[in-house]
Amino acid sequence: MGIIKTLDSTISNKIAAGEVIERPQSVVKELVENAIDAKSTSITIEVEEAGLSKIKVTDNGSGILEEDLELMFRRHATSKIENEHDLFHIRSLGFRGEALASIASVSKVRVTTCHDGSIGRQIDVIDGETVNRTLAQARQGTEITVESLFYNTPARLKYVKSLHTELGKITDIINRFVISFPYIKFTLVADGRVLIASNGNGKMQEAMAVVYGMKIAQDLVEVNGRTGDYEVHGFIAKPEHTRSNRHYMSLFINGRYIKNFMLTKAILSGYHTLLPVGRYPILAINIVMDPALVDVNVHPTKQEVRLSKESQLMELIERLIKEKIWKQNLIPKVEKKKVLETFQQQKFEYDLLREHRDKTKQSDYSEQTAVNQIDEKFKEQHKTAQLDKQRVPDGESTQKTTGFISDSAAELDTTSEILPEKNESSDVIENISTDTSREKRKIPYMEIVGQVHGTYIIAQNEDGMFMIDQHAAQERIKYEYFKKQIGDVGLEMQSLLIPITVTLSKDEAINLNKINILLKDIGIHLEHFGGNDYIINDIPVWFPDNYEETVQELIDYALQHRQIDLNKFREETAIMMSCKKSIKANHYLRITDMNYLLEELAHTVEPYTCPHGRPIIIQFTTYELEKLFKRVM
């Protein structure tokens, strides 16, 4: 007698439930997808104890025929497909016929439905078996109640997370449905409390306001585009609205929420250097395509998909994001609330200091001495600013300068420490010019006012006040300069009087052949000198002054990223060089140098962020300043 046996339906359904029904969120997802497939325009989800105790999904869809009530709980019973051709032309969210059978095998289910105005029907299913069937009063549509989830699979129940975590998972999937199907009214109620309520008016941007809040929704940028095979529509947030993970990036194909690494990569390439390292944008993009071009039958959850002509879709998404995002004003404005919080904290600290001073009964003489010291610093600073103003050429005589009180008296000792002599300034600003077209400025004209802490340039125009990070500004300028030079096929080289010697380990020497193509592309030619030593006799003329350190870092980077493509290596090289060569914090500049820096920045391709994605310019509008000082209410 053989030992291989056919499992009965109860056991096989519980096995299938292990893949399909992982947690309460899985039940909610499957039931809501069925409601959407039933052409519902209103769907209400009610959960108790994060769905473990009870999940009820009510819709106003087409309802279920009487003869289908019991059949719907059989495994692989579905109304969505009939043959193999249908499997590759799926337009519905559900199609596998596994979900309801899996749910019924690990819970107690009640279905109440009314189809096309007929008499209502009700059926109770426990452990996959029908235990009751009767007539019932019911509105048009279907109501499915799932109770005691995982009551008969204690091992699965043991690994369910906290109620807070599970409710968060349910909220997340409903948020995706709200965005993907804005024409459906969704309501999520948890333990009697309404968590989500969309209006179902068909507008994706308003649906995103329900999920992400009005402030972000108002700052969204719409993207639209199509090719012969794909149509893309959605909304993307400006780079100032980012998150620490990809959780806020929603991709949909024909309304189905999916996860796809290559499409995510295309999105990030569209933002390019606008995003800070480790930050991700907020967006929702729906892709409409022929179902024959997408295979959703990859995993029971149906979130992983395989795409035909994937590279074309990637190019379309990347191009649309680039075209839209770079047309926006990407200078972030300061939030009044955050500024006020800072002021209030400073006031609190000042009040504590004053209270302490009163308790210790500090003498009036001590207080006056402190005031005098500050006054002397201000006078010295003002004197320095006047000296600098005298050095400015006639053409710059109209520039205004303002002194800022320094925390350290040592910074105020001499004029040269605050404003370097001309040869120092020119060394700081050298080689930052790019050959970028000068036809159009990307940032507004502004008048330099001064500098704070040798780090931030203060400027103004009729629209308000601007703060510019001088390091980030020059980093952007140099990045575009170096990137252009590195991409030049005719590299102009200079011979070194003393060759650079590089010593590699055995492992590095073995892998050297793999990275030589990368190094040669940017003008680094390693010649074997003996043993593990290599020499470099020539470098490109545009290489930074500290070329030995730069060369070593580039070799190290290439060895660590041997699989990197050529374009990515060029970009990383430009980023590395621009960062090291740019002026740093606590470096004081002349007004003329600040003007030159801003003028160069204005004509870069992307003047809003440094290559690492940090903002370069922040704006305080005149209205915001007036509100801070209570000039307007």
From Swiss-Prot:
InterPro entries given in the database record: DNA_mismatch_repair_CS (IPR014762), DNA_mismatch_repair_MutL (IPR020667), DNA_mismatch_S5_2-like (IPR013507), HATPase_C_sf (IPR036890), MutL/Mlh/PMS (IPR002099), MutL/Mlh/Pms-like (IPR038973), MutL_C (IPR014790), MutL_C_dimsub (IPR042120)
SMART domains in the record: DNA_mis_repair, MutL_C
One GO process term, biological-process aspect: mismatch repair
Classification via PROSITE patterns: DNA_MISMATCH_REPAIR_1
Gene Ontology MF terms in the entry: ATP binding; ATP hydrolysis activity; ATP-dependent DNA damage sensor activity; mismatched DNA binding
Pfam families: DNA_mis_repair (PF01119), HATPase_c_3 (PF13589), MutL_C (PF08676)
Keyword Cell cycle listed: no
UniProt GO cellular component terms: mismatch repair complex
Alphabetized UniProt keyword annotations: DNA damage, DNA repair
SUPFAM superfamilies, alphabetized: ATPase domain of HSP90 chaperone/DNA topoisomerase II/histidine kinase (SSF55874), DNA mismatch repair protein MutL (SSF118116), Ribosomal protein S5 domain 2-like (SSF54211)
PANTHER family listed in its UniProt record: DNA MISMATCH REPAIR PROTEIN MLH, PMS, MUTL, DNA MISMATCH REPAIR PROTEIN MLH1
NCBIfam families: mutl, PRK00095.1-3
Family listed: Belongs to the DNA mismatch repair MutL/HexB family.
Function: This protein is involved in the repair of mismatches in DNA. It is required for dam-dependent methyl-directed DNA mismatch repair. May act as a 'molecular matchmaker', a protein that promotes the formation of a stable complex between two or more DNA-binding proteins in an ATP-dependent manner without itself being part of a final effector complex.
Protein name: DNA mismatch repair protein MutL
Species of origin: Macrococcus caseolyticus (strain JCSC5402) (Macrococcoides caseolyticum)
Lineage: Bacteria, Bacillati, Bacillota, Bacilli, Bacillales
